[in-house]
Regions:
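Catalytic domains that recognize anionic headgroups
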Residues: 1-374
Length: 374
Protein backbone atom coordinates (compact mmCIF):
# COMPACT_ATOMS: atom_id res chain seq x y z
CA UNK A 1 0.00 0.00 0.00
CA UNK A 2 2.90 2.35 0.75
CA UNK A 3 4.33 1.92 -2.74
CA UNK A 4 0.91 2.45 -4.31
CA UNK A 5 0.49 5.65 -2.33
CA UNK A 6 3.96 6.85 -3.28
CA UNK A 7 3.32 6.10 -6.93
CA UNK A 8 0.04 8.02 -6.85
CA UNK A 9 1.70 10.96 -5.16
CA UNK A 10 4.47 11.01 -7.78
CA UNK A 11 1.90 10.94 -10.56
CA UNK A 12 0.00 13.89 -9.12
CA UNK A 13 3.13 15.98 -8.59
CA UNK A 14 4.33 15.19 -12.10
CA UNK A 15 0.92 16.03 -13.55
CA UNK A 16 0.84 19.40 -11.76
CA UNK A 17 4.44 20.34 -12.57
CA UNK A 18 3.49 23.09 -15.01
CA UNK A 19 1.51 24.82 -12.27
CA UNK A 20 3.93 24.26 -9.38
CA UNK A 21 6.96 25.42 -11.38
CA UNK A 22 5.25 28.24 -13.30
CA UNK A 23 6.73 31.10 -11.29
CA UNK A 24 10.21 29.62 -10.89
CA UNK A 25 13.11 31.64 -12.29
CA UNK A 26 16.83 30.98 -12.14
CA UNK A 27 17.49 34.71 -12.59
CA UNK A 28 20.24 33.55 -14.92
CA UNK A 29 23.08 35.80 -15.97
CA UNK A 30 26.23 35.16 -17.94
CA UNK A 31 29.53 36.18 -16.42
CA UNK A 32 31.57 35.65 -19.60
CA UNK A 33 31.12 34.83 -23.27
CA UNK A 34 33.35 33.49 -26.01
CA UNK A 35 33.87 35.35 -29.29
CA UNK A 36 32.00 33.98 -32.28
CA UNK A 37 29.52 31.15 -31.98
CA UNK A 38 29.04 29.11 -28.81
CA UNK A 39 27.76 25.53 -28.91
CA UNK A 40 27.20 23.34 -25.84
CA UNK A 41 26.30 19.64 -26.06
CA UNK A 42 24.86 17.82 -23.05
CA UNK A 43 24.70 14.12 -23.87
CA UNK A 44 22.78 11.72 -21.62
CA UNK A 45 23.83 8.11 -22.15
CA UNK A 46 21.83 4.99 -21.38
CA UNK A 47 22.91 2.04 -19.20
CA UNK A 48 26.63 2.61 -19.80
CA UNK A 49 28.55 1.20 -16.87
CA UNK A 50 32.16 2.33 -16.60
CA UNK A 51 33.55 -1.18 -16.13
CA UNK A 52 33.03 -2.05 -19.80
CA UNK A 53 34.74 1.03 -21.17
CA UNK A 54 38.31 0.66 -22.36
CA UNK A 55 38.89 4.21 -21.07
CA UNK A 56 38.36 2.87 -17.54
CA UNK A 57 40.76 -0.05 -17.91
CA UNK A 58 38.52 -2.68 -19.52
CA UNK A 59 40.61 -5.30 -21.31
CA UNK A 60 38.51 -5.21 -24.48
CA UNK A 61 38.77 -2.52 -27.15
CA UNK A 62 35.39 -0.92 -26.56
CA UNK A 63 36.76 2.62 -27.02
CA UNK A 64 39.09 2.37 -30.02
CA UNK A 65 38.20 5.86 -31.24
CA UNK A 66 37.91 7.84 -28.00
CA UNK A 67 41.21 6.30 -26.89
CA UNK A 68 42.82 8.30 -29.70
CA UNK A 69 41.31 11.62 -28.57
CA UNK A 70 44.19 13.30 -26.74
CA UNK A 71 42.20 16.23 -25.35
CA UNK A 72 39.46 14.16 -23.70
CA UNK A 73 38.68 14.62 -20.00
CA UNK A 74 37.46 11.39 -18.37
CA UNK A 75 35.74 11.62 -14.99
CA UNK A 76 36.68 8.43 -13.15
CA UNK A 77 34.57 8.49 -9.99
CA UNK A 78 30.98 9.30 -10.95
CA UNK A 79 28.04 7.43 -9.38
CA UNK A 80 24.44 7.68 -10.52
CA UNK A 81 21.87 9.04 -8.09
CA UNK A 82 19.32 6.44 -9.25
CA UNK A 83 19.45 3.13 -11.09
CA UNK A 84 16.30 3.90 -13.09
CA UNK A 85 15.98 6.19 -16.11
CA UNK A 86 12.73 7.79 -14.97
CA UNK A 87 14.39 8.99 -11.75
CA UNK A 88 17.96 9.50 -12.87
CA UNK A 89 17.38 11.61 -15.98
CA UNK A 90 15.17 14.22 -14.25
CA UNK A 91 17.92 14.68 -11.68
CA UNK A 92 20.46 15.01 -14.51
CA UNK A 93 18.27 17.71 -16.07
CA UNK A 94 17.73 19.49 -12.75
CA UNK A 95 19.75 21.45 -10.20
CA UNK A 96 18.05 19.43 -7.44
CA UNK A 97 20.06 17.12 -5.19
CA UNK A 98 18.71 13.89 -3.70
CA UNK A 99 18.47 15.59 -0.28
CA UNK A 100 15.90 18.04 -1.65
CA UNK A 101 13.96 15.76 -3.97
CA UNK A 102 10.63 17.53 -3.42
CA UNK A 103 12.14 20.61 -5.07
CA UNK A 104 12.19 18.65 -8.33
CA UNK A 105 8.49 19.45 -8.75
CA UNK A 106 8.96 23.18 -8.15
CA UNK A 107 12.09 23.99 -10.16
CA UNK A 108 12.56 24.11 -13.88
CA UNK A 109 15.47 22.38 -15.56
CA UNK A 110 18.47 22.92 -17.80
CA UNK A 111 16.59 24.04 -20.94
CA UNK A 112 14.81 26.75 -18.93
CA UNK A 113 18.12 27.90 -17.45
CA UNK A 114 19.72 28.28 -20.88
CA UNK A 115 16.57 29.94 -22.22
CA UNK A 116 16.91 32.59 -19.53
CA UNK A 117 20.57 33.06 -20.47
CA UNK A 118 19.65 33.84 -24.08
CA UNK A 119 20.45 30.52 -25.75
CA UNK A 120 18.58 28.71 -28.48
CA UNK A 121 17.75 25.36 -26.86
CA UNK A 122 17.17 21.92 -28.37
CA UNK A 123 16.18 18.59 -26.85
CA UNK A 124 16.82 15.72 -29.27
CA UNK A 125 15.86 12.27 -28.04
CA UNK A 126 16.45 8.78 -29.32
CA UNK A 127 13.98 7.47 -26.74
CA UNK A 128 10.21 7.61 -26.67
CA UNK A 129 8.34 10.36 -24.89
CA UNK A 130 8.16 9.40 -21.23
CA UNK A 131 5.02 11.23 -20.13
CA UNK A 132 6.76 11.99 -16.85
CA UNK A 133 9.28 14.34 -15.28
CA UNK A 134 11.79 13.86 -18.10
CA UNK A 135 9.29 15.40 -20.50
CA UNK A 136 8.32 18.14 -18.05
CA UNK A 137 11.90 19.36 -17.78
CA UNK A 138 13.02 18.67 -21.34
CA UNK A 139 10.01 20.24 -23.02
CA UNK A 140 11.04 23.71 -21.87
CA UNK A 141 13.51 23.51 -24.75
CA UNK A 142 12.50 25.76 -27.62
CA UNK A 143 12.84 22.90 -30.11
CA UNK A 144 12.05 19.19 -29.63
CA UNK A 145 12.97 16.26 -31.86
CA UNK A 146 12.09 12.61 -31.20
CA UNK A 147 13.82 10.18 -33.53
CA UNK A 148 11.88 7.26 -34.93
CA UNK A 149 13.21 3.74 -35.53
CA UNK A 150 15.74 2.23 -36.05
CA UNK A 151 16.99 4.57 -33.32
CA UNK A 152 20.72 4.27 -33.74
CA UNK A 153 22.47 7.04 -31.83
CA UNK A 154 24.41 8.26 -34.86
CA UNK A 155 21.06 9.69 -35.96
CA UNK A 156 21.44 12.16 -33.11
CA UNK A 157 24.59 13.51 -34.73
CA UNK A 158 22.71 13.83 -38.02
CA UNK A 159 20.20 16.07 -36.25
CA UNK A 160 22.95 18.11 -34.60
CA UNK A 161 24.50 18.77 -38.00
CA UNK A 162 21.16 19.94 -39.39
CA UNK A 163 20.56 22.26 -36.45
CA UNK A 164 23.97 23.89 -36.59
CA UNK A 165 23.88 24.25 -40.37
CA UNK A 166 20.44 25.87 -40.38
CA UNK A 167 20.33 27.88 -37.18
CA UNK A 168 21.51 31.48 -37.21
CA UNK A 169 21.80 31.63 -33.44
CA UNK A 170 25.21 32.43 -31.97
CA UNK A 171 24.44 30.64 -28.69
CA UNK A 172 23.06 27.11 -28.81
CA UNK A 173 22.46 24.34 -26.27
CA UNK A 174 21.72 20.85 -27.57
CA UNK A 175 20.64 18.14 -25.12
CA UNK A 176 20.87 14.65 -26.61
CA UNK A 177 19.15 11.69 -24.96
CA UNK A 178 20.74 8.49 -26.26
CA UNK A 179 19.43 4.94 -26.51
CA UNK A 180 22.97 3.80 -25.78
CA UNK A 181 23.10 0.34 -24.24
CA UNK A 182 19.42 -0.17 -23.51
CA UNK A 183 18.43 -3.83 -23.69
CA UNK A 184 18.17 -5.60 -26.15
CA UNK A 185 21.78 -4.71 -26.72
CA UNK A 186 22.18 -6.21 -30.19
CA UNK A 187 19.49 -3.82 -31.46
CA UNK A 188 21.47 -0.75 -30.41
CA UNK A 189 24.04 -0.87 -33.23
CA UNK A 190 24.15 -1.61 -36.98
CA UNK A 191 25.48 -5.03 -37.91
CA UNK A 192 28.80 -3.61 -39.10
CA UNK A 193 29.48 -2.76 -35.46
CA UNK A 194 29.08 -6.39 -34.34
CA UNK A 195 32.77 -6.57 -33.44
CA UNK A 196 32.50 -9.05 -30.57
CA UNK A 197 30.82 -12.30 -31.64
CA UNK A 198 28.66 -14.22 -31.22
CA UNK A 199 26.20 -11.51 -30.18
CA UNK A 200 22.97 -13.38 -30.85
CA UNK A 201 19.64 -12.39 -29.35
CA UNK A 202 19.40 -15.08 -26.66
CA UNK A 203 17.44 -15.86 -23.54
CA UNK A 204 18.69 -14.20 -20.37
CA UNK A 205 20.55 -16.98 -18.61
CA UNK A 206 23.97 -17.56 -17.09
CA UNK A 207 24.94 -19.98 -19.87
CA UNK A 208 24.39 -17.20 -22.42
CA UNK A 209 26.35 -14.58 -20.52
CA UNK A 210 29.19 -14.29 -23.03
CA UNK A 211 26.84 -13.56 -25.91
CA UNK A 212 25.01 -10.97 -23.82
CA UNK A 213 28.31 -9.33 -22.84
CA UNK A 214 29.46 -9.38 -26.47
CA UNK A 215 26.33 -7.54 -27.54
CA UNK A 216 26.63 -5.10 -24.64
CA UNK A 217 30.26 -4.38 -25.47
CA UNK A 218 29.32 -3.81 -29.10
CA UNK A 219 26.79 -1.22 -27.95
CA UNK A 220 29.52 0.53 -25.93
CA UNK A 221 31.78 0.42 -28.97
CA UNK A 222 29.02 2.08 -31.01
CA UNK A 223 28.64 4.75 -28.33
CA UNK A 224 32.38 5.26 -28.63
CA UNK A 225 31.97 5.81 -32.38
CA UNK A 226 29.08 8.21 -31.87
CA UNK A 227 30.92 10.31 -29.30
CA UNK A 228 34.17 10.37 -31.27
CA UNK A 229 32.39 11.42 -34.48
CA UNK A 230 30.49 14.09 -32.56
CA UNK A 231 33.75 15.47 -31.20
CA UNK A 232 35.27 15.38 -34.70
CA UNK A 233 32.33 17.37 -36.01
CA UNK A 234 32.56 19.99 -33.26
CA UNK A 235 36.30 20.23 -33.85
CA UNK A 236 35.66 20.97 -37.53
CA UNK A 237 33.45 24.01 -36.89
CA UNK A 238 35.05 27.34 -37.74
CA UNK A 239 34.80 30.34 -35.42
CA UNK A 240 33.02 28.20 -32.80
CA UNK A 241 33.68 27.74 -29.11
CA UNK A 242 32.20 24.38 -28.12
CA UNK A 243 32.07 22.10 -25.11
CA UNK A 244 30.61 18.62 -24.67
CA UNK A 245 29.58 16.81 -21.48
CA UNK A 246 28.55 13.14 -21.53
CA UNK A 247 27.32 10.90 -18.74
CA UNK A 248 25.26 7.73 -18.56
CA UNK A 249 22.03 7.76 -16.57
CA UNK A 250 22.89 4.52 -14.75
CA UNK A 251 24.87 1.32 -15.16
CA UNK A 252 23.87 -2.30 -15.75
CA UNK A 253 24.16 -5.78 -14.27
CA UNK A 254 25.44 -8.44 -16.67
CA UNK A 255 25.19 -11.65 -14.60
CA UNK A 256 28.52 -10.64 -13.07
CA UNK A 257 28.69 -12.81 -9.96
CA UNK A 258 26.90 -15.43 -7.87
CA UNK A 259 23.81 -13.22 -7.63
CA UNK A 260 23.27 -13.60 -11.41
CA UNK A 261 21.61 -10.19 -11.59
CA UNK A 262 20.75 -8.65 -14.95
CA UNK A 263 19.73 -5.17 -16.17
CA UNK A 264 19.08 -2.44 -13.54
CA UNK A 265 16.25 -0.69 -11.62
CA UNK A 266 16.27 -3.19 -8.75
CA UNK A 267 15.30 -2.12 -5.20
CA UNK A 268 18.85 -2.87 -4.05
CA UNK A 269 21.84 -1.70 -6.06
CA UNK A 270 25.15 -3.13 -7.21
CA UNK A 271 28.46 -1.50 -8.09
CA UNK A 272 27.71 -2.30 -11.73
CA UNK A 273 24.48 -0.31 -11.66
CA UNK A 274 26.02 2.67 -9.85
CA UNK A 275 29.39 3.31 -11.51
CA UNK A 276 28.86 5.21 -14.77
CA UNK A 277 30.97 6.54 -17.61
CA UNK A 278 31.32 10.31 -17.88
CA UNK A 279 33.57 12.56 -19.94
CA UNK A 280 34.02 16.08 -21.28
CA UNK A 281 35.63 17.68 -24.31
CA UNK A 282 36.47 21.30 -25.10
CA UNK A 283 37.30 22.87 -28.44
CA UNK A 284 40.53 24.78 -28.94
CA UNK A 285 38.72 28.10 -29.00
CA UNK A 286 36.94 27.23 -25.74
CA UNK A 287 40.27 26.24 -24.17
CA UNK A 288 41.78 29.57 -25.17
CA UNK A 289 38.87 31.55 -23.72
CA UNK A 290 38.31 29.52 -20.54
CA UNK A 291 41.63 27.89 -19.60
CA UNK A 292 40.71 27.94 -15.90
CA UNK A 293 37.57 25.84 -16.51
CA UNK A 294 39.48 23.28 -18.57
CA UNK A 295 42.24 23.12 -15.96
CA UNK A 296 39.64 22.56 -13.23
CA UNK A 297 38.00 19.76 -15.23
CA UNK A 298 41.35 18.04 -15.68
CA UNK A 299 42.16 18.49 -11.99
CA UNK A 300 38.78 16.96 -11.08
CA UNK A 301 39.07 13.86 -13.28
CA UNK A 302 39.46 11.62 -10.22
CA UNK A 303 37.23 13.66 -7.90
CA UNK A 304 34.31 11.81 -6.26
CA UNK A 305 31.05 12.93 -7.85
CA UNK A 306 27.49 11.91 -8.57
CA UNK A 307 25.24 12.75 -11.48
CA UNK A 308 24.17 15.78 -9.39
CA UNK A 309 27.33 17.50 -10.63
CA UNK A 310 26.25 17.37 -14.28
CA UNK A 311 23.68 20.18 -14.28
CA UNK A 312 25.99 22.51 -12.37
CA UNK A 313 28.96 21.58 -14.54
CA UNK A 314 27.03 22.32 -17.72
CA UNK A 315 25.84 25.68 -16.40
CA UNK A 316 29.37 26.57 -15.34
CA UNK A 317 30.78 25.50 -18.71
CA UNK A 318 28.56 28.17 -20.26
CA UNK A 319 29.48 30.72 -17.55
CA UNK A 320 25.90 30.93 -16.30
CA UNK A 321 25.19 31.95 -12.72
CA UNK A 322 21.89 32.27 -10.90
CA UNK A 323 19.61 30.88 -8.22
CA UNK A 324 20.08 27.23 -7.26
CA UNK A 325 23.44 27.01 -9.07
CA UNK A 326 26.56 25.95 -7.22
CA UNK A 327 30.22 26.25 -8.20
CA UNK A 328 30.95 23.72 -5.46
CA UNK A 329 29.01 21.14 -7.50
CA UNK A 330 30.70 22.02 -10.82
CA UNK A 331 33.49 19.81 -12.14
CA UNK A 332 34.82 22.73 -14.21
CA UNK A 333 35.29 24.89 -11.13
CA UNK A 334 38.35 25.05 -8.85
CA UNK A 335 35.78 25.46 -6.06
CA UNK A 336 34.40 21.93 -6.61
CA UNK A 337 33.77 20.32 -3.22
CA UNK A 338 35.34 16.87 -3.10
CA UNK A 339 34.15 16.38 0.47
CA UNK A 340 30.42 16.76 -0.23
CA UNK A 341 28.47 13.68 0.88
CA UNK A 342 27.24 11.43 -1.91
CA UNK A 343 23.64 10.27 -1.63
CA UNK A 344 21.42 7.89 -3.57
CA UNK A 345 17.68 8.29 -4.17
CA UNK A 346 16.08 5.05 -3.03
CA UNK A 347 12.69 3.53 -3.91
CA UNK A 348 10.99 5.71 -1.27
CA UNK A 349 12.58 8.88 -2.68
CA UNK A 350 14.82 9.13 0.35
CA UNK A 351 18.43 10.29 0.11
CA UNK A 352 20.62 7.56 1.60
CA UNK A 353 24.38 6.88 1.69
CA UNK A 354 25.48 4.46 -1.01
CA UNK A 355 26.57 1.95 1.60
CA UNK A 356 22.90 1.67 2.61
CA UNK A 357 21.59 0.74 -0.84
CA UNK A 358 21.95 -3.01 -0.44
CA UNK A 359 25.57 -3.30 -1.56
CA UNK A 360 27.36 -6.55 -0.70
CA UNK A 361 31.06 -7.29 -0.09
CA UNK A 362 31.56 -8.16 -3.77
CA UNK A 363 30.34 -4.68 -4.69
CA UNK A 364 32.74 -3.07 -2.24
CA UNK A 365 35.55 -5.09 -3.79
CA UNK A 366 34.62 -3.77 -7.24
CA UNK A 367 34.69 -0.20 -5.94
CA UNK A 368 38.03 -0.83 -4.23
CA UNK A 369 39.44 -2.12 -7.51
CA UNK A 370 38.53 1.16 -9.21
CA UNK A 371 39.76 3.31 -6.34
CA UNK A 372 36.28 4.48 -5.33
CA UNK A 373 35.50 5.24 -1.69
CA UNK A 374 31.90 5.45 -0.47
Amino acid sequence: FYNLGLSGSEFRKTHHFERTSRDFRFEARRTAEAPGREVYLYIIGEAARAMNWQLYGYDRETNPELSQVDDLVVFRDVLTQSNTTHKSVPLILSSVNTDEHEELYRRKGLPALFNEAGFETWFISNQSRQGAMIDNLAHDAQHLIYIRSPRYDMQLLDEVRKVLERSRSQKILLILHCYGSHFSYHQRYPREFAHFKPDDDVAIAAQHRQMLVNAYDNSIRYTDHFLARTIDYLRSLDDTSSALLYCADHGEDLIDDRRERFLHASPTTTAYQLYVASLAWFSERYRERFPEKVAAAEANEAAPATTHALFHTMADMASIEGRCLSKEASLVSPEYDRTAPRRYLNDHNEAVPYRKTGLLPEDMEVFRRYGISL
